[in-house]
Amino acid sequence: MNEILIITTYYPPETGAAANRIAQLANGLEKNGFKVTVITPLPNYPTGRIFKNYKGSFHKTSHEDHITIHRLWIYASNSKNKLLRLLAMLSYSFSLLWFFIWKKVPNKVIVQSPPLLVAFTCMFFLNRKKRKLILNVSDLWPLAGLHLGVFKKNFAYRILEFIEHFNYRKADLILGQSEEILAHISSLCPNNKTFLYRNYPDFEMPRLEESYQDNDKIKLVYAGLLGVAQGVFKLCQKLDYSTIEFHVYGAGHEKESIINYISNNPSLPIIYHGEVSRGYLHPELIKYDLAIIPLRNRIYGSVPSKLFEYSRLGLPVLYFGGGEGEKIVEKYSLGWIAKVGNYSNLNIVLSRINKADFTLKNKVSIQQVALNQFDFNRQLKKFIKQL
């Protein structure tokens, strides 16, 4: 049997797009005849604390859905402090080194990047002539950090760029979740083999029914990470609520700020539903009219996986993130676009949308696009041929 190792920083029972994406890849490879092993830290995201059932462990191994999962020790932290975040990544990197020394590593390895330091550890220490290293790039780091204002172009930034370029050079195959990511990598390493691997979901498509609502207001929903990059707190402050009510699901750095804002502004139609499981969320999402996908700043290379997830649910989107995601929404008629960072334009776009736009026919049409254009299994089979 073909053996393959996946090294990641996020994996269930952690929640979020990153954990779901890697779990889906692992399950897909297993179903296609691979013996899959996953290495991941002890679960701690998004709280920054090791989950209750894993506390006190240094290394915990389990077998789930025919996949072997090694969960390694990490200094868990979700602090904004850069030194604490660095310490977390260093601790996981040392745990990986310990694993590489004492355990046999297969000849096919998929490494998730970012985090850059974890990817560097893998690309440096696992580099062998007979081993195929596949680098799965979901964000262009440190460039994305520069766009978000996390980094300045200084000595530390140049070190991160060096690590980024090193990782690309050592990869036998690079997966990128967007055309922009692949273009950036090809500009740095033109001889590298690349493959466009979108974050397509793989769940049963729900059957949609006509909904009748007395409320004239549009039910707008956001579901996901409540982080700095998404800017949902600012969204709560800037939205014009004349024609909408705003529902929020998720957790992250901005959670408390959002809860406090709702508490201090009880007249605004903002409802925070907390963090829920993906299985619970999907049936809830199809009850809404429109989902918003925001990015506080345009991040080169970023295409939020929600875009593909919502299309499978038949849920129209209001895309507020710029870049390649805009082009996908336009090309496949998945919803509406507002200029990234321009809240006046966002409110103008919202004011021009009415309840009559959310017909069953339109929602089914969006699902059909997902079926024909965003198919996980079709993409996976093409990827397997590259292995």
Regions found by a protein language model. Give the residues of each.
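Membrane-proximal helix-turn-helix segments that form the acceptor-binding/catalytic region
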Residues: 94-97, 117-120, 124-128, 154-174
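N-terminal subdomain of nucleotide-sugar transferases
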Residues: 1-65, 202, 237-240
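Nucleotide-sugar donor phosphate/pyrophosphate-binding loop at the beta->alpha transition
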Residues: 132, 143-166, 203, 228
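Conserved donor-binding/catalytic core segment of Leloir-type glycosyltransferases
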Residues: 213-230, 236-247
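Carbohydrate-associated surface elements
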Residues: 180, 197-200
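Nucleotide-sugar-dependent
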Residues: 230, 277-284, 291-311, 317-328
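Nucleotide-activated donor-binding/catalytic signature segment of Leloir-type glycosyltransferases, i.e.
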Residues: 217, 245-250, 256-282
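A charged, aromatic-enriched C-terminal amphipathic alpha-helix characteristic of glycosyltransferases
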Residues: 341-347, 357-387
